[in-house]
Regions:
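Typically the conserved alpha-helix immediately C-terminal to a functionally engaged Cys/Sec
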Residues: 2-14
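Short acidic, S/G/P-rich loop/turn micro-motifs used as interaction or catalytic elements
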Residues: 1, 25, 61, 365-368
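Non-transmembrane, aqueous-exposed alpha-helical and coiled segments at domain scale
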Residues: 108-411
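Conserved beta-strand segments of the P-loop GTPase G domain that flank and frequently precede/overlap
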Residues: 1, 19-21, 360
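Iron-sulfur (Fe-S) cluster-binding modules
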Residues: 82-115, 122
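Thiol-based oxidoreductase modules, predominantly thioredoxin-like and allied folds used
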Residues: 14-38
Length: 411
């Protein structure tokens, strides 16, 4: 459509330079500069074609995007320019903003440099198999963290890629935002998941949580990452059916990224510092969202002092999930009794001081409590009261079991 306009501009504006992004012979009969590598388009920040730019002494003074006849006439000073054309056409998206290649262009021309050591593969090597053979995976295939993918991941945060977030245990290696992004790529995260990965890493690498201790124990435990806030819905986290299972990208890849970071950067590999005797599948990923909107109770985050509008991450050291079955209880007291009986057996029924638990209620059980107007605090207190037991029943040797608490706790 703009060929006649370009031809006329070439005649009346001798200093005009025409750039073409794809066909170097376009437009016919007009001398043009090929921009097949899109360098000129990238540096000129071209969003739409055609774009008409005026420069004075190398500095842009004005531009118009797409075809708006009145603006082209005003900028060029040609009163009858494009008389045969429609008044307005929006133009087409520039190839330099094509989602399939924009990350490659950012690496080539964006001036941003990745500082992590790059590993080159031989042309005959299978990149997925090499990631296995070099020990970069958790036993499942990982996404190769190309510079383009890492740059795309970094777009998920405004933090400086070279900011040191923590010293990653167990080897206490400087963990930068860039290295977090690399492992998030490998885990399969989208850029919008990156802030959640960063928050979880910041949480587990505190003295209070002590991820080094979680790794070094022989117990089958791993970080359980519980997410709250409107951001969980924005990124599509699962807080409903199959909440602890497979099938949700955000849940699985956020948790997986955290595990890969501790393995690949911190050095927490199984059989080395990671001394778990059995482990459990949650050591691949154990991350889920609470149903903030559907729950009849105060959310975990709010109960811990946060506002419901805030996005939060809570981390807990947990073993694999276990099922609590009670299909008959219709009174809250009955259901609380069931929960107490099941919780009493966590790890060992005679070691009540040693272990904590996270209780995840499904809608049916939650409804029993809600219909009785029990608050979150009431549910916890009722279960706690039912977990009391005589010290004589849990000391070492009682009930024919050597395990138990010390004799000093006997009544």
């Amino acid at each position: 459509m703009v060929v006649p306009v370009i031809a006329r501009l070439m005649r009346e504006l001798p200093s005009l330079t025409v750039y073409t992004q794809d066909d170097p012979t376009f437009p016919e009969g007009v001398t043009s500069v090929s921009d097949l590598d899109l360098a000129a388009s990238w540096h000129a920040d071209i969003d739409t074609v055609p774009t008409l730019i005026f420069r004075a002494n190398g500095v842009e003074t004005k531009r118009t995007i797409g075809w708006l006849r009145s603006e082209w006439r005003e900028l060029t000073g040609i009163a009858d320019l494009g008389s045969e054309l429609p008044e307005f056409r929006p133009g087409c998206g520039s190839m330099s903003v094509d989602p399939d290649i924009v990350d490659k262009l950012r690496v080539l021309y964006g001036g941003e440099v990745l500082h992590s050591r790059q590993i080159e593969f031989a042309s005959a090597e299978d990149e997925f198999e090499v990631m296995f053979s070099r020990g970069f995976t958790d036993g499942l295939p990982v996404v190769p963290p190309t510079p383009e993918r890492v740059m795309r991941m970094l777009s998920g945060t405004t933090r400086d890629p070279q900011e040191v977030v923590v010293l990653a245990p167990p080897d206490l290696v400087e963990l930068t935002i860039e290295k977090i992004a690399i492992n998030a790529v490998m885990a399969g995260c989208l850029p919008e998941y990156l802030p959640w990965v960063i928050a979880a890493i910041e949480a587990i690498c505190t003295d209070e949580y002590n991820i080094h201790g979680v790794l070094a124990t022989t117990m089958p435990v791993a970080p359980v990452i519980i997410c709250n806030g409107p951001g969980t819905r924005a990124i599509g986290m699962n807080s409903g059916v199959n909440v602890l299972g497979q099938g949700n990208r955000a849940n699985l890849t956020i948790g997986r990224a955290v595990q890969l970071i501790i393995r690949n950067v911190g050095g927490g590999r199984p059989g080395e510092v990671d001394r778990a005797a059995h482990g459990h599948p949650g050591k691949l990923s154990f991350c889920f969202a609470e149903d903030d909107l559907g729950s009849p109770f105060t959310s975990l985050a709010v109960s811990r002092g946060f506002d419901a509008t805030q996005n939060t991450v809570t981390v807990f050291t947990g073993e694999g999930p276990r099922c609590v079955v009670d299909q008959l209880a219709r009174e809250p007291e009955q259901l609380a009794q069931t929960f107490a009986a099941c919780l009493r057996t966590v790890h060992h029924p005679k070691l009540p001081f040693a272990f904590d638990a996270v209780l995840v209620l499904g809608p049916e059980h939650a409804r029993v409590f809600a219909q009785a107007n029990w608050s979150r605090e009431r549910v916890l207190q009722e279960i706690h009261d039912r977990l009391q037991m005589p010290g004589s029943e849990i000391v070492r040797g009682a009930g024919g079991m050597a395990e138990g608490v010390q004799e000093a706790f006997k009544d």
